[in-house]
Amino acid sequence: VPDSNTDGRTRVYHVPSIASIGAPTVAELNAGTQIDTLMTPDGLVGFEPDTGDVDNSKLSSTFNTVAAGRVSFSGTMLRLIKQTGTDTLYNTLVYGFATNVVVRRDVTSTTAWAAADKVEVYPVQCGEVRNLAPEGNAVHKYEVMTKITTQPNLRATVA
């Protein structure tokens, strides 16, 4: 079985309004804004879940056992490239702005949304923008902290 290459195969949108994060519609997604075209290659930061441990060992146990506990995310953010002139994305993703980060993986990023697409939907509130230190031979980069406000749907299907 061949490996799945991620180059050019991750689509990321910010979508302010989704009625059901388990089944976002093509119309809702098309009303959002594509942001993967303004992200650095490592710009989708911290959107990997971690599962806590619940110690369920017994006093009589001779082996420590655990069960799956709460799921959490840590340090989620978007690392983006600043645009010259009017930068709509920079001016939109401001402190307190609520939106949904929608991620589709393993399909060419230029492929339009379609019913039955598998996506991840993260309801977030933006933190303060952090402009990164200037570097030689580099573009102006900035980060937007994203606070996940309700449980995301990591296996949503586009309706």
Say what each PLM segment does.
Residues 55-113:
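Structured, beta-strand-rich domain cores
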Residues 12, 71, 95, 119-121, ...:
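Hydrophobic transmembrane signal anchors and adjacent membrane-proximal interface regions, especially
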Residues 92-97, 141-143, 158-159:
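Short intrinsically disordered coil segments
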Residues 24-33, 90-97, 111-129:
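Surface-exposed flexible segments
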Residues 1-79, 125-140:
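Solvent-exposed edge beta-strands and adjacent loop segments
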